[in-house]
Structure formats: C-alpha cells, structure tokens
Swiss-Prot record:
Coiled coil: none annotated. One of its GO terms (biological process) is acetate metabolic process. It holds the Pfam family Acetate_kinase. Disulfide bonds: none annotated. It is found in: Cytoplasm. NCBIfam families: butyr_kinase (TIGR02707), PRK03011.1-5 (NF002834). InterPro entries: Aliphatic_acid_kin_short-chain, Aliphatic_acid_kinase_CS, ATPase_NBD, Butyrate_kin. Its main location: cytoplasm. This is Probable butyrate kinase. GO terms for cellular component: cytoplasm. SUPFAM superfamilies: Actin-like ATPase domain. Its EC number is 2.7.2.7. Belongs to the acetokinase family.
C-alpha cells in the first residue's frame, strides 16, 4: 500500500512515500527566517507549506494516488493515543489551537491531499496523548495539575514493534519506555495505555540535554522572586538552557559521553547524574506498574550511546529485561500506524475531545 507521510516542523517540512513499511522516497527542506518572515501567525503558512509539498511531489513525478495520507499530529486537546481519522472537529481545534506550532498544519494539508486522492487521512499519537490515571494528575497544590506531554508517537511505535517481535499485542504488555533525546520522557505503559509519564517539556522528571527536569520547589520560587530574572528567562532555564546545557555549556551527548568515558570531569559527574535521574524515574514507573513489567525499552537518540546505555543498565536491569531500540523515526512510525489502520490491525479512533 502507498502511504504518504507529512511532518511539518517549526522551520522544516519533511515528506516521504512508503510502500507498506518500506520508505521509497523522501524529500524536504529547511525554511529560512526569510522564507517565513511574511507570516505573522503559523496558520498563515498553510498555503505556503501545502504548495511546497505539492511542488516536491510534482518535481519527483509522483502522482496523487495514495492509499492513505498521514501527518504528524498537532497540539490538539488532550486525547487518548491511537490512529485518528482527520475530521472537522480536529481541523477546527488545530486552526484555533491555544499553542501555535507548524505541526498543527500537518493534518490540514494531509486532509486536502487525501481528498484529491479519494483516500483516508490520518494522524497518530500526537504529543498531547493523555491517558493518565486519576491519581497521576493530582499534586499537592490544587491549582496545579500534572499534564501529559511526552514523546507519544515514538514511545508507542517502539512499544508496538517490540510487542510484535515477541508475538504479542501492545495491549497485552506492561512496559516502561524511556525516550532519551533533547527531552527525556519515562512512561508506564499499562496494557496499551500510558497511565503515568513525566511532562518531558515543562520541568518535570529527569533532567536532560536541554531541560531542567524536576527542581526543588522552594529554591525555584526564591529564584523566580529574586528580581534577577524575567519569567521568560526562568522558562528558558527549565526548557532550552537547562540540564547538560546549563552545567556544561553544550548539549552534544556524543562529545559529553566520550569525555565521560575517559573519566574527564565535570562531564562524567554531570552525565552520570542525569542518567541517575532517568533511572530513578524508571524505578517510579516500576512502582506505578506494581512490579509487573515485561520490559524496559530504551529509545531516542541517546540510546545510541554505549556509555549512557551501560550506565543505565547497571541501575535498572534488575527491574525487568532492558530492550534497546535506539533512534527516533517519526516518518516510519507514522507510516507504521497508517498501515496498521488500513489493514484493520489498529482500531481507528474518532476525535471527540471532552
């Protein structure tokens, strides 16, 4: 089956054609600041991005005769995971989303191209997947509720692939999935639902190459009211200039891991501390799953690092078997989900937020 995949990022647009799960063509480009300067809001980029996609297809002589079109999910209202048919409610919510991001355009472009092809249009496992159990939402401050923001697409895709590799369904397994990238998310996957996971974007859980993770609340409050920093600067400390970047002045884990493996400080101490926070979070998810864990999956770019994987395994491999599935293949994950929906192997969800 011919599956067309669209993945708009803040400064790039990537597209690919798959025959079943095999990529047969890919293209894309980085959009410069000049390219996007005329657009004051992301929604205004719709025609520009759509025409860009159609031009690349025309230049490659690829006709619009796909069996399905699937796009990266946007910043919708919280919704359970799965493959969703693009509907009018979804398009309305993307056009009126609280947060602007180019990923909101993916489903809109996919829907229009799919209409020309007379084929279904999907999204799968957007970043806003929310399957938290009730106890995981509450905090000690009633005005603050925990929210689910994590690497849903990759985490669920590797979970399904692992399940298939052992002759099981994702919905039969309990898994801890550790996504190791610029942000780090550690989720408890209970029979196909992520019932607890740290907010990998906004200051919760392990610290990461660019993010601060959980910070002692009293000290953070004092920092906020010290008069030294603006709200924007504090938020940048939490996401963008936190973690390894704050300690070491770099986010290049390949370089940091090489120095750490040679015993060079402060690289070894800081990287080992980051991995310690990851292991602690995995331990917390072990408790969430009441010790009934079939496997711990390590995925994301940092899972390519022998040093990081080795340190983590020393701390968590007594909990459950550790499975290595490094990297992050968003395009392949989207194609995998579309194929599953076309074959009837993955149930098609209807977007109806509460």
């Amino acid at each position: 089956m011919k599956i067309f995949v669209i993945n708009p990022g803040s400064t790039s647009t990537k597209i690919a054609l798959f025959i079943d799960e095999k990529p047969v063509w890919a293209a894309g480009a980085h959009h410069t600041a000049d390219d996007l300067s005329e657009f004051h809001h992301v929604n205004e980029q719709y025609a520009y991005r759509k025409d860009f996609v159609l031009r690349l297809l025309a230049e490659a002589d690829i006709p619009l005769d796909f069996d399905a079109v699937i796009a990266r999910g946007g910043l919708l209202k919280p919704t359970p995971g799965g493959v969703y048919a693009i509907n009018e409610q979804m398009k309305h919510d993307l056009l009126n989303a609280r947060m602007e991001h180019a990923c909101n355009l993916g489903a809109l472009i996919a829907d229009e191209i799919a209409r020309e092809c007379h084929c279904p249009a999907y999204i799968a496992d957007p970043e806003v997947v929310d399957e938290l159990q009730p106890a995981a939402r509450l905090t000690g401050i009633p005005e603050i509720e925990r929210i689910s923001i994590f690497h849903a697409l990759n985490s669920k895709a590797v979970s399904r692939k692992y399940a298939a590799s052992i002759g099981k369904h994702y919905e039969e397994l309990n898994l801890i999935v550790v996504h190791l990238g610029g942000g780090i998310s550690v989720g408890a996957h209970c029979k196909g639902r992520v019932i607890d996971v740290n907010n990998a974007l906004n200051g919760e859980g392990p610290f990461s190459p660019e993010r601060a993770g959980t910070i002692p609340a009293d000290q953070l409050a004092e920092l906020c009211f010290s008069g030294k920093y603006t709200l924007k600067q504090i938020k940048k400390m939490l996401n963008g200039k936190g973690g390894l970047t704050a300690h070491l002045g770099m986010n290049d884990v390949v370089t940091i891991a090489r120095k750490a493996s040679e015993g060079e400080e402060p690289y070894k101490g800081v990287l080992d501390a980051m991995l310690y926070t990851v292991a602690k979070q995995a331990g917390a998810m072990y408790v969430t799953l009441r010790g009934q864990v079939d496997a711990i999956i390590l995925t994301g770019g940092i899972a390519h690092s022998d040093y990081c994987v080795g340190i983590l395994k020393e701390q968590i491999d007594y909990l459950a078997p550790v499975v290595l599935m490094p990297g992050e293949d968003e395009m392949g994950s989207l194609a995998y989900n579309a194929l599953g929906a076309l074959k009837g192997e993955l149930p098609l969800q209807v977007y109806r937020p509460e």
